[in-house]
Amino acid sequence: ELSAITQYINNENRISCGDCSLAKTLIGIAMAEMMHLQKLGELIVLLGGNIDYTAKYRDGRKKMWTPECLNIPAQVKSMLLADIESEKAAINQYEAHMKMIKDDCVNRVLARIIKDEEYHIILLRALMK
């Protein structure tokens, strides 16, 4: 979610043009992603975890999040395609986590976030027309 927020805000900043509906839609999606990040953080803390913004690999290594995690093309169409791919990757990741997590409450939150991500894809595809 941190990558999504940063990517959407970066894209919005680079294409912003006052009343531009494209930029407004991207900033709206970024706000939804912020809510996802907040809810996930809240769940992690409630379940006794720590928030550290690192990626944890299967071999135990950790890597701190950096802007290198982003895909930021120069052309608007490429931006939107990268955003769609990021949303699809997020959905796949949430679905994989739901298979590992046996807590119905947590899985309901993840399922709700997936619905938002699916809606973001619909919005992004509409912007490409």
Task: Tell me what each language-model feature is.
Residues L2-K129:
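Non-heme di-metal
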